[in-house]
Amino acid sequence: MKQRLQDSIDLKMKYQTRSYNQLAFVNCLQGKCEEAIQNLSTAETILRENHEDEFDKRIIITYGNYAWVYYHKGQLTKAQSYLDKLERICQQFPDASRYTAMIPEVYGEKGWSLLNSGVQQYKEAMECFETALEQDPSNTDWIVGYAIVLSRLEQLSGVTESVDSSHSVKQWRRVLKLDPNDAEAMVQLALKLRVFEQYEEADTLVKQALEKSPGVPYVLRYAAKFYRCAGNIEKALKLLDKALKMSPNSAFLHHQKGACYQNKIKTLKKTRGSIDSGKIDKLINDCKDCFTKAFELKPSFIIAKLNYAHVCSINGEYREAEKIYNELLELENTCPENKQDIRFEVGLFEQNYKHSKSNAIKYLLEGFKIKYDSKSRNNCRTHLEKIAENPQQDIVAFCIRGIIHMLDGEECFEKILEIERGKIVTCSR
């Protein structure tokens, strides 16, 4: 996270104040309070120079962070001085508390902070953006944040919608209606449209985005992802190399480059006839190097580790793959989606490479039993159902179906209880 924030600052991307505030928070957590104070001082200077007319609204977060950092430094008088500044500002807003005014600017910034804090915070981030937009519906900054979090939640759910029912598509179109030159919104919308097979419009949007912002890393990386998903691997690699020159320490970019090599490996493996073993070996090494770099830069990058293990499996390095899978299975402090991803990939490894049907079922069931709606959970279910499609109708198939039906029944019962609790709360008001 710290590297990503530093990249956004070094590349002079929009909303640097936000990056400095979040960097201050990270530095304070790491005990680097002096660096945190310097980050906040820079954020304050940017606001004074660029937003003089809205300074009081926009400075609330920064002053709150000042108070928090000085409190952690043990400088209580200094912390109180910033609380006093907040109190004077909050007096301007009728519904404000003593030190906090819950105005759109505060809700919006809180939404961005939560969005950058990980998957567990996405739903609360969505609610913050919704609240901000209720009061300021034309603020493209909040709409972009709202569109991003909706896109991620839709992707996590694994539920295939239609282009007309996708809430994130509506929000990305809303951004472009207010700001037709927003290249970042163009590539994000293009990625969503490609999912719904709107290929022509998606391709046009990516080309327009690259014409408008050919040197913006954010545009380059998502355009590269678009071309990789479209099968144009060479185009994707070219864009990723360009982006890496500007952001050499981006775990995301290294991972995307590894994913491109992984696609090339799969294509070559499927090719009939003689295969250049030297070419395959080089691709595998390049692929592993990219994934290694990604999780070295971001140790919590579970997908990069899973991808690395999968490449080891393809290359016959089963012991290395198994070692990584076992390490990942022992992780406790990770989000439910990561736990599902791990168990799904381990299940496939057991089924396809170790040829252990019983172990595959064990891990796929573990993934499915984690009650968190996600694409990986759906994948676990789909593979279990395929295993259960046994023409001999053996006891294993019946057990799998029984467990799936039992879990479905539990979830239906829990939803009924939630609805009934909601009725009771409504009646008691």
Question: What feature does the model see in each segment?
Answer:
Residues R4-M13, I46-K57, I89-I103, W142, ...:
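Flexible helix-coil transition and linker loops at the boundaries of alpha-helical arrays
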Residues S8, A43, L86, A132, ...:
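Canonical positions in the second alpha-helix
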Residues K14, K57, P137, P180, ...:
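Short coil turns that delineate tetratricopeptide repeat
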Residues Q16, L23, Y66, I103, ...:
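Structural register within alpha-helical repeat arrays
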Residues S19, A96, W142, A185, ...:
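TPR alpha-solenoid repeat register
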Residues V26, V69, S113-L115, V149, ...:
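Residue-level signature for tetratricopeptide repeat
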Residues H51-E52, G74, N116-V119, A147, ...:
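Short coil/turn linking the two alpha-helices of tandem helical-hairpin repeats
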